[in-house]
Structure formats: structure tokens, C-alpha cells
């Protein structure tokens, strides 16, 4: 399995949807939001680690059309886009290089204007409670299968506790289904940040505060090739398709196994005092 080069699969992909239409409006949205993010970042004390590595992976994804998923802890409603203010302008304000991300329907898609604005900002609507097979998840897999960058918050909701919530199995579905479609395992890049919970505490008005200490760390790449290889022989994608077609429990077991692997690797970038997570729910027959 190849998680670094998807060029051999590009000819089998549909036309890539990398900039929402109308494109000039999408470019306007990213420019406006990018300027605001840069301004907000400048008003805080920011410490970063590994940003150059993240920029390099974003460039590779854009050039090689190699699927990439960035994951981060979720501390406030504005983690995305504010945290991207540390990226260079050539990425931050270029919608063709920017991430796709998931947005809650009850927050970002509550009226026509919000829906249009956030769609132009490459947000994909997710309905909380509709599970891992909903339309928004399918669209996210489409974007990954085109070799694009997708950013998600795998906890699935905001948490300002010191320890993480367990990662939702939808993360495993994104990785597994992208491989099943394309033969390429998405690269997973972990990001951990501290300070956003002080900028936007849940009990107060949802206005980003300034003058905070913000720390953003990009960890080592997470590879899922070995996990997926346990389900197939000689890189035969048909083996995986046959396995996943048997029943929903086997599918969820596959997705959960990938998710647990990513979860374990993600723990490595978290300060020891903040490590730990809640247990996962049991897979039912």
C-alpha cells in the first residue's frame, strides 16, 4: 500500500472539486477570513512547533493529489479557522490549497447566508446524531479520494477538559473508505493546541479574547498502512470490499481499529498530565 503517492490513481478520479463555486466568492471568503485570523494571531502570544512540517505536507498534498487528514483537539467554536492564522498567506488565503472541514448543521448551516458563506469556506455539513454513513461523511470521502486535504476534530464536539474525549469512528471510515476507493491510505497529521479554551470559555459570550498564551504543536505523521494490511492479502482491495460487505458489525470493527490506532499515536503529542481518554462504546450485533 502507498500512502505517499497517489499519482497512479489520479486518472481514475473525477474532476477535482477543490474550490467551491462561484470561485471568486470562495477566494473572497478565504481572503477575508485569512486577514482576520492573522490579526487575531498577532494579538496573542503564540508558540508553535512543527508548522514548517505541516506546510510541507500541505504543499505535497496540493502538488501530488495525495489524500491527507489533519486532526486536532476541539476546544472552541473558532479553533477552525483561527488556528490556521499561523500558516503562510499563500496557503491561508488560497482556497485551492486550503482544507475541507466538517461543520455542524445546527451552528454553521442554520440559514441561507450562513450555509452559503461556510460552503464557500469549504465546510461540509454534518448533522450530529446521524452517524458515520450520512451524506456529509460521504462527501468528505469524495474529497479525500480526489487527493485533497481534510481537517476534522475527531472528538466530535467541543471539550474544555484537560483529557480528550474518545475519537469518533467516522475517522476510521474516512481512512478506510478512501483506501478502498483509491488504493491510497490517507496521511494523518496530528495537531495539538492549548489556549483556545481561554480565548473562548464555554460559559461566556462566544467572542474570541486576545492576550492569551497559545501553543500549537504538530506531531509526527500517523500511518495506517499496517492496520489496514491486517484485513487484506497482497494488497488486494477486493479482500477489504468482501470483508466490509459482510455485515455492519465487521465494518464498524474495521473503522474502530483504525480509529484506535490513530488515537494511540495522537497521545504521543499530548503532555503526559493531559493524556487519557474515555472508553469507546461496545459494537453491537
UniProtKB/Swiss-Prot annotation:
PANTHER family xrefs: TAFAZZIN, TAZ PROTEIN TAFAZZIN
Functional summary from the UniProt entry: Acyltransferase required to remodel newly synthesized phospholipid cardiolipin (1',3'-bis-[1,2-diacyl-sn-glycero-3-phospho]-glycerol or CL), a key component of the mitochondrial inner membrane, with tissue specific acyl chains necessary for adequate mitochondrial function. Its role in cellular physiology is to improve mitochondrial performance.
Name of the protein: Taffazin
Organism classification: Eukaryota, Amoebozoa, Evosea, Eumycetozoa, Dictyostelia
InterPro entries recorded: Plipid/glycerol_acylTrfase (IPR002123), Tafazzin (IPR000872)
Subcellular location field: Mitochondrion outer membrane; Mitochondrion inner membrane
Entry membrane topology: Peripheral membrane protein
Reactions mediated catalytically: a 1-acyl-sn-glycero-3-phosphate + a 1,2-diacyl-sn-glycero-3-phospho-(1'-sn-glycerol) = 1-acyl-sn-glycero-3-phospho-(1'-sn-glycerol) + a 1,2-diacyl-sn-glycero-3-phosphate; 1-hexadecanoyl-2-(9Z,12Z-octadecadienoyl)-sn-glycero-3-phospho-(1'-sn-glycerol) + 1-(9Z-octadecenoyl)-sn-glycero-3-phosphate = 1-(9Z)-octadecenoyl-2-(9Z,12Z)-octadecadienoyl-sn-glycero-3-phosphate + 1-hexadecanoyl-sn-glycero-3-phospho-(1'-sn-glycerol); 1'-[1,2-diacyl-sn-glycero-3-phospho],3'-[1-acyl-sn-glycero-3-phospho]-glycerol + a 1,2-diacyl-sn-glycero-3-phosphocholine = a cardiolipin + a 1-acyl-sn-glycero-3-phosphocholine; 1-hexadecanoyl-2-(9Z,12Z-octadecadienoyl)-sn-glycero-3-phosphocholine + 1-hexadecanoyl-sn-glycero-3-phosphocholine = 2-(9Z,12Z-octadecadienoyl)-sn-glycero-3-phosphocholine + 1,2-dihexadecanoyl-sn-glycero-3-phosphocholine
Organism in which the protein naturally occurs: Dictyostelium discoideum
Amino acid at each position: 500500500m502507498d500512502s505517499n503517492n497517489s499519482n497512479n490513481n489520479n486518472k481514475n478520479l473525477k474532476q477535482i472539486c477543490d474550490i467551491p463555486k462561484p470561485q471568486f466568492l470562495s477566494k473572497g471568503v478565504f481572503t477575508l477570513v485569512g486577514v482576520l485570523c492573522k490579526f487575531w494571531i498577532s494579538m496573542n502570544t503564540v508558540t508553535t512547533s512543527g508548522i514548517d512540517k505541516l506546510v510541507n505536507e500541505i504543499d505535497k498534498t496540493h502538488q501530488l493529489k495525495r489524500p491527507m487528514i489533519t486532526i486536532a483537539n476541539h476546544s472552541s467554536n473558532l479553533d477552525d479557522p483561527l488556528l490556521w492564522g499561523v500558516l503562510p498567506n499563500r496557503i491561508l488565503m488560497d482556497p485551492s490549497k486550503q482544507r475541507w472541514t466538517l461543520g455542524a448543521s445546527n451552528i454553521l448551516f442554520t440559514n441561507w447566508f450562513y450555509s452559503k458563506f461556510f460552503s464557500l469556506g469549504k465546510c461540509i455539513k454534518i448533522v450530529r446524531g446521524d452517524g458515520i454513513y450520512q451524506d456529509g461523511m460521504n462527501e468528505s470521502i469524495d474529497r479525500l479520494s480526489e487527493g485533497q486535504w481534510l481537517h476534522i476534530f475527531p472528538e466530535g464536539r467541543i471539550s474544555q477538559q484537560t483529557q480528550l474525549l474518545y475519537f469518533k469512528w467516522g475517522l476510521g471510515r474516512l481512512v478506510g473508505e478512501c483506501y478502498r476507493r483509491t488504493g491510497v491510505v490517507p496521511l494523518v497529521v496530528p495537531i495539538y493546541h492549548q489556549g483556545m479554551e481561554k480565548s473562548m470559555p464555554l460559559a461566556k459570550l462566544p467572542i474570541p479574547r486576545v492576550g492569551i498564551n497559545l501553543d500549537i504543536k504538530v506531531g509526527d505523521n500517523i500511518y495506517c498502512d499496517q492496520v489496514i494490511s491486517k484485513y487484506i492479502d497482497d494488497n488486494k482491495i477486493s479482500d477489504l470490499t468482501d470483508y466490509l460487505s459482510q455485515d455492519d458489525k465487521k465494518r464498524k470493527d474495521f473503522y474502530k481499529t483504525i480509529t484506535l490506532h490513530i488515537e494511540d499515536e495522537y497521545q504521543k503529542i499530548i503532555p503526559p498530565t493531559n493524556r487519557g481518554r474515555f472508553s469507546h462504546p461496545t459494537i453491537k450485533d
